[in-house]
A protein has these predicted regions:
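Nucleotide-activated chemistry modules centered on ATP-dependent adenylation/adenylyltransferase
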Residues: 2-244
Length: 244
């Protein structure tokens, strides 16, 4: 079965067939396949420009620097992340940065003081991250994520290809270890996120991200003290108007 034999409409059968066919393909080759062969003009990389985002950004830039790179500007990012984003876009020659932003009226109504994260973090993530991304991905058949199986228990069984409603998520780094990421960044001479050296192995919005102690789960600093471990973009199919 070749890539062209599969009808890529995001159904579970298509994702399963792709998984079986390309499970042994290395990450860089998988990205080239997805961008140039499987979903030409219909795929985007979603990047947080976080702790190890530079790996996928570098790989995508080598395949096609015009590939859409979607960044969700929640309005709550660290300043370091925003500067790092601009640095990487320029350095890697990425030419299609897509900004996904929260609906201003919704934010003004539900979070005018920017403290919704403290009382209802799920709703805060929904209006600031989930819904903006759902709108931004409306015209794509597939999107690329940077999830890795070592990050949390909820990500330990993430496949390479994952059905999401009428789209497919491609997870090329799912089998990578933390050492693999570090080695790639060093070998390619890429700049690390400035907060990594300060104890932030996983970086999200400023109010809900804290330092991680040695030996802790890499995402232990996200929503610390709560049972929440995901923002919502990977827990349900992305649909505008969904209630997480």
């Amino acid at each position: 079965m070749s890539a062209h034999d599969v009808r890529l409409f995001g159904d579970a059968i298509a994702a399963s067939r792709l998984e079986d066919r390309f499970a042994k393909v290395k990450a860089s080759s998988l990205l080239r396949l997805a961008i140039e062969d499987l979903y030409p003009g219909r795929i985007a990389l979603v990047s947080s420009f976080g702790a190890d985002s530079v790996v996928l950004l570098h790989m995508v830039a080598q395949v096609d620097p015009t590939t859409p790179v979607v960044f969700v500007d929640t309005g709550q990012h660290f300043d370091e992340t925003l500067r790092y984003r601009d640095e990487l876009v320029a350095r890697l020659g990425l030419t299609n940065l897509v900004m996904a932003e929260p609906d201003r009226e919704t934010v003004a109504e539900e979070d005018p003081e920017k403290f919704l994260f403290a009382s209802d973090p799920d709703r805060c993530c929904d209006i600031r991250k989930v819904q903006p991304l759902a709108r931004a991905l409306g015209g794509y058949d597939a999107w690329i994520t940077g999830r890795k199986s070592f990050q949390t228990a909820t990500r330990s069984r993430v496949p390479l290809f994952e059905a999401e409603g009428d789209r497919v998520k491609v997870n090329p780094l799912v089998g990578w270890s933390a050492t693999d990421l570090i080695d790639y960044i060093r070998a390619a001479g890429l700049p690390p996120h400035p907060l990594v050296a300060k104890g932030f192995p996983s970086i999200g919005c400023l109010p809900c991200t804290s330092r991680v102690a040695p030996g802790e789960d890499p995402r232990a600093g996200r929503w610390r003290g709560r049972t929440k471990s995901e923002c919502g973009i990977h827990t349900e199919p992305l649909n505008v108007g969904q209630d997480i």
